[in-house]
């Protein structure tokens, strides 16, 4: 994924970096260091889970609702050995633009969207399952800035 990578290091500690979403650092030959958050699912499905609530008891936000200090989110399916590498700022931009709509569609189980609740000891983690093709299109379109839009922050172009 990074042809100019010179080193890869793992963040195994429970530290500030981990709280900011950093699981790995990739050093490039230019000297730039990329921060990566990793998400894993055993079996590949036609969707990507976006965790919007980490803990239903405390109300802690899920990772998609946090200002993580990462460059990329690596979303891997273990059995198929396929990994989607999402630029974090574009993924967040897509979520901020469409998250409410996706949540509504998931609540109604429309177009492949579903709500997922993962039981943990003493709490539940909540995610929206977004069809992979729709998420990829939304992230792609998040890279297009509409300079004609009113307001201080231009909106991404809505996928068709």
Give residue ranges: language-model regions.
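Short beta-strand or tight-loop elements
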Residues: 20-22, 69
